[in-house]
From Swiss-Prot:
GO BP annotations listed: L-cysteine catabolic process to pyruvate
Protein name from the UniProt record: UPF0597 protein APL_1605
GO molecular function, one term: L-cysteine desulfhydrase activity
InterPro entries in alphabetical order: Ser_deHydtase-like_asu, UPF0597
Stated family: Belongs to the UPF0597 family.
Amino acid sequence: MKFKSELEQAIIATVQQEVVPALGCTEPVSLALAAAVARQYLGALPDRIEAKVSPNLMKNGMGVTVPGTGTVGLTMAAAIGAIGGDPNGGLEVLKHITNEQVALAKQMINDHKIEVSISDTEHILYSEATLFNTDQQVKVRIAAHHTNVIYIEKNGELLFSKPCVVESENAENVFANLNAKDIYDFSLNVELEKIRFIQQAAILNSALSQEGLNQDYGLHIGRTLQKQIGKGLISDDLLNRIVIETTAASDARMGGANLPAMSNSGSGNQGITATMPVVVVARHVAAGEEQLIRALFLSHLMAIYIHSKLPKLSALCAVTTAAMGSCAGVAWLLTGKFEAISMAISSMIGDISGIICDGAANSCAMKVSTSVSSSYKSILMALDDTQVTGNEGIVEHQIDRSINNLCAIASRSMQYTDRQVIEIMVSKPKSL
C-alpha cells in the first residue's frame, strides 16, 4: 500500500499522541490532574475534596500505588494532586511532589477530608474533582482521555466547557481503512527521521526496568526471577530475559517508582509491554539503530492499531494486546517476514484471549509476564512454521479477522464481565 502524505502524517501524529511519558498508573493520575487543575483555579489549599470517577476508573485506581507517595488508592491521588500536582504536567502531574506535600495529603486522608465515589456517567474514562476552601469551590472534569479537561466551574460560574464525544460514538479513526499488513509496511518504509522519536520509549522503559531490578517494588516478580538464575532454578536464556526485564519495569511502575514510563494507548504497562521485549531481543541479535527504531515503531503502532478496536478501558487486560504489538516487533527482528508476525499473533489470540482486567494493581506485572511469555512462545512456533489455525476457536485464517473477533468479545460480550468485576471489587471487605 502506498501511503499518501496526509495519512502518513496522521499515523505518525497518532503514535506521538498515544506514546507519551506517564508517571504512575494513568487512571489515578487522571484524577490527580483534575485535582491539580482545580487547585490552580481555587488559588489555595483545599479544606476538603469530593471526587467522582467512572466505574472503570474506580476499578483501575483502587489497588495501585500513587507514585512518590507509597500509598494506594484514589483518595491519595486526589489529595496529592490537589496539594502538589502540576496542572500543566499532563500524565507527569506528580513529577515534582515533595515529602512535605505527601505528609499533608496523608493528613487530609486521615482527617477524612476526601471522598471518592462512583459517578453515573456515560464515559468509560471519567474523573471529577471538586475542591472546597472556606466559601470557595472549584469543580474540574476530565473525560474520554486521561488529560482531556472538558469542564471547569468556580463558585457556580462556568469558566470553561467543551463538548466531549462519547467513546462509543467512534470519532474518525486513522486506522479505519488499514490492516495489519499496512501497519507492517508503513513501519518498514516510513522515513527513519520521522519516527526516531520512538527511541525515547526504550530509554525511559529501560530505566524503569533497571529500577525494578535494583529495588523491591510491588510483587518484585522480575527481581525474584532474576535471583532464581543465580540459584540455578531457571536459565539465563532469551525468554527469561524478556520476561524478567519487562516485568521488572511493570513492578516498578505499579509499585510507585518515581520514574516515568513511556505509555501506549494511555497505559504505562502497555507501553512497557510494547517496548521491553523489543529492546531485549534487539540487544540479543546486535540489531543496528535503524532496526531497533523500526522494530519499536512497528511494535507500538501495531499495539495502537489493535487497541483502537477496543474501548478505552474494558474487562480485557490490554497488556495482552500490547504484547501482540511487541510480538510483531520481535518477530520482524528475528525473521524479517510479515508471515511470521501473522502466525505468531494468531497463536497469541488462541492462547491468552480473555484474560480479565481486574483493576490496576501490583499483580498487573503477573499479567505482563504471562503476555510477553506467550508472545515469545508464539514466535518460536512461527519459526517452526506452526501456529494456532483458523480451525480453532476464535482464530481465523486471516489475522485481521482474528483480531476483530478478539476485540468484538472485549467490546461487547465482556461488558457484563466488567460490571461483575467492579461489583466484586467495591464490595470486598477492607483489609485489616
